[in-house]
C-alpha cells in the first residue's frame, strides 16, 4: 500500500539523506554558484488535487539552471508547429556530457534533444526569432505558472555565465555553420543564461511544474498551458534525457520523468498526481544533485510511485 504524504514524512527523508552531505561537489565553473553552501536540503510537493507539502530549505530560492530548459521548450511549443521544432532538434538521449561538441559535429549540427545545452540553445534561437522580448515573456510565464509575482533573474549569475561562455558560444557557432542557428549568437546566449539564472524555491518549482502532472493544465489558470499530447511528450523527454547521461540510472532508481540543473535542483513528475521539487547543491559526476536523487529515490519507494 502506498504511504500517505505529509510534512513529517518529508522531514524524515531529509534526516535520512543528510549524511550524504559532503560526498558531492558544488558547481564551481562560475563563482556565483560556487559560493552556495553545500549543506542545503529542501523538498516540496504539489498535488493535482490542491495539496502542498514542504520540508527543509524548501522556501529558499536557488539558481534553477537547466531546469529552465523545460520551460523554454514549453514556450516554443506555444509558438511553433510540432514539425518546425523537431526538424531542428531531436528527441533521443545523447549519452554524452551536456555541453559536448563531439556528437554535434558528427550529426551535422542537429542536437540530440532539447535538454542538452545545444538543444536548449536551438530552442532559445527559435524564441528569439518569434518573440519580441523573450526574456520578459519567460518571466511572465514563470510568474503565472507559479502564482508568484516577484520571481526574477539573478543578474550576477547571468553575467558570470556569459563571462564564462566559451564552450556554449562554440556550440552555437558550430550549429550556425550547419545552418541550424539563425540569430546573433551573443543575443541568444544572453537569453539562455538569463533563463538559467532564474531564482526559485522548491515550493515555487513544484507549483510551476504541476501542469505536467495534469495533462498540461495548471489548476489556477483558465486555459491549458500546453495540450495533453504535448504534456505527455515533454514528460517522455524528461524521462529519457532530463538527467543528462545518467537518465538510465535515474529511471532505475527513481522511475519518474525529471529534469535537473547544476544549481542542485531537480523537478520530478508523477503523472496524474503531483510535481516534486528537491534541492541540494552538491552534485555527482554527471552534474545532478547527489542528495537530490537520493531524496527522490527514498520518496518514491516510500510512496510506492513509479511510471514503471
UniProtKB/Swiss-Prot annotation:
Gene3D superfamilies: DD-peptidase/beta-lactamase superfamily. GO terms for molecular function: glutaminase activity. One of its GO terms (biological process) is glutamate biosynthetic process. Its EC number is 3.5.1.2. Substrate binds at residues 66, 117, 161, 168, 192, 244, 262. InterPro entries: Beta-lactam/transpept-like, Glutaminase. Keywords: Hydrolase. It comes from the Bacteria. It catalyses: L-glutamine + H2O = L-glutamate + NH4(+). HAMAP family: Glutaminase. Belongs to the glutaminase family. Homotetramer. This is Glutaminase.
Amino acid at each position: 500500500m502506498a504511504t500517505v504524504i505529509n510534512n513529517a514524512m518529508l522531514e524524515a527523508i531529509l534526516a535520512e539523506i543528510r549524511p550524504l552531505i559532503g560526498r558531492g561537489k558544488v558547481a564551481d565553473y562560475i563563482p556565483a554558484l560556487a559560493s552556495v553552501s553545500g549543506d542545503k536540503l529542501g523538498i516540496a510537493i504539489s498535488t493535482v488535487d490542491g495539496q502542498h507539502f514542504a520540508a527543509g530549505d524548501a522556501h529558499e530560492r536557488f539558481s534553477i539552471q537547466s531546469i529552465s530548459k523545460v520551460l523554454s521548450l514549453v514556450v516554443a511549443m506555444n509558438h511553433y508547429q510540432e514539425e518546425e521544432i523537431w526538424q531542428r532538434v531531436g528527441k533521443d538521449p545523447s549519452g554524452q556530457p551536456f555541453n559536448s561538441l563531439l556528437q554535434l559535429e558528427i550529426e551535422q549540427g542537429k542536437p540530440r534533444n532539447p535538454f542538452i545545452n545545444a538543444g536548449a540553445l536551438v530552442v532559445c534561437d527559435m524564441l528569439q526569432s518569434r518573440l519580441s522580448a523573450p526574456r520578459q515573456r519567460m518571466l511572465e510565464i514563470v510568474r503565472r505558472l507559479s502564482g508568484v509575482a516577484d520571481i526574477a533573474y539573478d543578474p550576477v549569475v547571468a553575467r558570470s555565465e556569459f563571462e564564462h561562455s566559451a564552450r556554449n558560444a562554440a556550440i552555437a557557432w558550430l550549429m550556425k555553420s550547419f545552418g541550424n542557428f539563425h540569430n546573433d549568437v551573443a543575443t541568444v546566449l544572453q537569453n539562455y543564461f538569463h533563463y538559467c539564472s532564474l531564482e526559485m524555491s522548491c515550493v515555487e518549482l513544484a507549483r510551476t511544474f504541476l501542469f505536467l502532472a495534469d495533462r498540461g493544465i495548471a489548476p489556477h489558470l483558465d486555459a491549458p498551458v500546453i495540450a495533453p499530447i504535448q504534456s505527455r511528450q515533454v514528460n517522455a523527454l524528461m524521462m529519457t534525457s532530463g538527467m543528462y547521461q545518467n537518465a538510465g540510472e535515474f529511471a532505475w532508481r527513481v522511475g519518474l520523468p525529471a529534469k535537473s540543473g547544476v544549481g542542485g535542483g531537480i523537478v520530478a513528475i508523477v503523472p496524474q498526481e503531483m510535481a516534486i521539487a528537491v534541492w541540494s547543491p552538491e552534485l555527482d559526476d554527471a552534474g545532478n544533485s547527489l542528495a537530490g536523487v537520493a531524496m527522490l529515490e527514498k520518496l518514491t519507494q516510500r510512496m510506492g510511485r513509479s511510471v514503471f
